[in-house]
Amino acid sequence: MNNSKLSVPGQYEDESSTIYVGNIDSRLSDEEIIKHFSKYGQVESIFRRLLDSFYPKEKAKPFKPPKNGVQYGFVKFVNAESIEEVLKDAKGMTLGQRKLTIKARVVNPAKLTDKKFKPNDTSITANVFNPSIQNNTDEENVKPGLKQSQIKEFIPNVEERNWETVRGINSRNPKPETTLTIPSLGLEDISMQVVPNAFASTLPLSILNLPAEVTPIDLYNHFKQAGVVKGTAVSQFLDQRGFRYGEVIMDSVESCQNAIEKLNNVPYKGSILEVSIKNKASSSVKSIPTTPTGESLWPFPSENANKTQINIENATCSKMTWIMGSPTKEKSQWGSVSTTGVSNQQNHPAAWNPDNKPQSIVHWDSLRESSPSIPNSPIDPSNLYVKNLDDTVITCKSQLEDLFSPFGSILSSMLACYPNSGISKGYGFVAFRQIEAAVRAKDTLNGMMVGKKRIFVCFAERKSDRIRRLQAFFANKPTSEQTAQQDNKALFVKPERSSTVTIRKPIESSTNKISENPTTLSSKVENKNEPKTGENKEPSQTNEYVNCKQENKELSGQLSGNLDIKKEAGKLSHDGEQGNLLKPLVFHANTKLNNRGSAKMGSTATNLKKIQDMLHNKKLSNAYFVPRARATTCTTLTYVTVEPSHFQDEDCNESTNMLSLVGYMDSYPEATSNIQKMNSYHIKDSNKENFLSTTKVNNNSPTTIQLTQI
């Protein structure tokens, strides 16, 4: 099979017998593919195309399979029954070394031609909701590609007016028109309505004084007790009192009344809610309201929406595009102004006045002075942004222009599409020649159902410009983000003074001897060069406050005297020989001022120096630890934190790692009270793996330091 134009999908007279095949190995030939699908029925033609190909389908070059590529294609059968057989075996179907993706053929409306429109095609009709007008008009069928002059009778109207009124020409006898008919795209059962039938009898509820932390889900859960909730929205901006504004759509008028009776003036999370039926936006309001009174989540046409003159700068910031949970700036936030700064001499559409009396004209400068709360307008109010487009209805740029062209002359438009596919991303931009046309299009199409989706239309502006404009409006009150940043600064306090104590690995002594005490875990440390038991040694000049070698019996009597050091360690003995001391269990240091010294320490720095010297001058036998100590010194207290890193020999016995004061307390009951006093200064960490010990030292009293493995 060759890739001729007749085999291109979209050109078939009948697409019901065509199937989509994805993930095709490009090294396979057409004959192999036909042979694979021939068991399901007679194959008429196939079409193959490489992924991410820049060539259009009609201009595809002769197929040259690459070395290793992925393709997709379409297989057309003679009979439509073959499609059902293929879909039954579609799951797990393989061809060559790849698993195929089999799907039914879906026709893209953009590929249809004018010849395929039949007289009985269903056209897309938009019925504008108006309680005072009954929509009994019949649907009309119009072919696509109509000029602006041919569809002038299909312009949406919420009030009685004709085409000349839309174009800016005054008319005293407007022709009523309530139906919008858009060219049919060959799709059935697709309607475009401003308000769906489910909401035809509902009114939006306005919720005031919402707490700042309330979300649309919280609002939904709170109002579902009054009836079925169809939608909720919470404004992202705070008022001057720190509250938010929200809206709720109920399923019926009875539910709205029930919600007002149950929830109005009722406390909710510390605030009193004000629930009421929202007023429709009206240009007859001559002052900017303090509360939002504009369009709702589901916009309803205003009775006088198209009867007033256009205020250029106010129109640009007059409404708010409400989204579920993330509403932006809209008319409900800023209100509306009845005056205008545009005169009739500028050939702009004049206002419709039921009394046929000219309205007063007030310049914008004077209006801005009287209403300083109105924010600046967008940079380009004639440029609109539309999103949530149905890709089955609006598939190309021309169809987007057909939707907006009834409101005025379009300067340019853009429909965002995925690269190399032509599939719409669901959003686009439309720029009008006149600002009035953009305002009319925005007011009418915002919230309208196009196909199966509700579109949202607002003025196009950059995010930075929008943030700058909103910050200028809310300059009197900081935003929640700025407030949070200011609160977080108070959580971090820098300490007054801190210094680091570095403890190095001690020098081991090969002449140390260990005496074993079988009843307790305590062991006394002896040195050949040191005096024996019972002999007292005067403190040396370099270690004035430290007496490193005292026997266990003398330690109990001198705990309140000069510095005593007790080291509890385990011992391994093999065949009667003394083993190496593997790990220190408990290390105590109790220091007291010498009689020759001052009764009080001179300063905090002197106290820190003594702690540092004491930690440096410890000599341990065969087992040692290299701690990392940090001392933070303030006016009256010194906090020392030590995190040791232990070293031990390979033949370490786990029994020697038992670290406790039990053995020491059993051997010397008279020292129990003193040990409890020492423990009162010690702050132990509950995490044993960290091996962290923190000691609080009082600078104005004798220092007690205890370093204990936790």
Curated annotation (Swiss-Prot):
Keyword Cytoplasm: yes
GO CC annotation, single: cytosol
Residue ranges constituting the RRM domain according to the UniProt record: 19-102, 222-292, 401-474
Keywords: Cytoplasm, mRNA transport, Nucleus, Repeat, RNA-binding, Transport
Annotated segments matching region Disordered: 333-357, 502-544
Main location: cytoplasm
Polar residues biased stretches: 333-348, 502-524
UniProt-annotated location(s): Cytoplasm; Nucleus
Basic and acidic residues compositional bias, start-end: 525-538
GO molecular-function terms, A-Z: mRNA 3'-UTR binding; poly(A) binding; poly(U) RNA binding; RNA binding
Presence of keyword Transmembrane helix: no
GO BP annotations listed: mRNA export from nucleus; mRNA stabilization; negative regulation of mRNA catabolic process
Function as written in the Swiss-Prot or TrEMBL entry: Binds the poly(A) tail of mRNA. Involved in the export of mRNA from the nucleus to the cytoplasm.
PANTHER family given in the database record: OS02G0815200 PROTEIN, RRM DOMAIN-CONTAINING PROTEIN
Protein name: mRNA export factor crp79
Species lineage: Eukaryota, Fungi, Dikarya, Ascomycota, Taphrinomycotina
